[in-house]
A protein has these predicted regions:
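CheY-like receiver
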Residues: 23-53
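C-terminal output helix
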Residues: 7-16
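Basic, amphipathic alpha-helical hairpins
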Residues: 55-67, 87, 91, 108-117, ...
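Short, hydrophobic alpha-helical segments
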Residues: 16-24
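Basic/polar phosphate-binding segments, predominantly the helix-turn-helix DNA-binding elements
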Residues: 69-99, 122-147
């Protein structure tokens, strides 16, 4: 939004409050919906509950660098092979790729919304090394974390954010 000079303090305060409110609304929406993008696949109630449980377990363990498909299957209560088969059937994604996808989407969210350096984000989402995180991020988003941050840091366009996190 552009303003003509001289600018009234009330107009400036109003514009800032509106921009902050819009940013908070988008932030809250995408915090809740960050791991969506698999929901458009038709699932019965039991499958939906399983998918919700799997995603919740992954999010709970997102900072754990040792979290693996074996640990996920143990927490879900089914064999690794059966969990792999179910997730492929329900969401068309393997458990390891689902874990990586959720971690990388959370990393993207942190890079856009927090003033946190890239190494810190890598550890917050469960990557043990900065280089592995950067390579995985580049493979997933098609750009480095630094390029991503530069491009989307002040983005408030809902459609663009939906493409990133959807």
């Amino acid at each position: 939004r552009f303003f003509t000079k001289p600018i009234s303090l009330e107009i400036l305060k109003s514009a800032l409050a509106s921009a902050i409110a819009t940013r908070e609304t988008i932030k809250n929406k995408y915090t809740r919906e960050i791991d969506y993008g698999y929901g458009d696949i038709k699932m019965n109630n039991a499958d939906n509950q399983l998918a919700t449980k799997v995603i919740a377990i992954i999010r709970k363990n997102i900072e754990n660098t040792e979290f693996s498909v074996e640990e996920l299957s143990r927490e879900v209560g089914m064999s690794r092979v059966h969990l792999n088969r179910k997730l492929k059937e329900m969401m068309n994604i393997s458990p390891s790729n689902l874990i990586r996808s959720i971690r990388l989407k959370q990393a993207a969210y942190l890079l856009i919304n927090n003033k946190v350096n890239i190494s810190e984000v890598a550890y917050k989402v469960g990557f043990s090394t900065h280089s592995y995180f950067s390579n995985s991020f580049h493979d997933y988003f098609g750009m480095t974390p630094k390029e991503f941050t530069a491009q989307y840091m002040n983005c408030t366009d809902e459609e663009t954010l939906k493409k990133i996190f959807g």
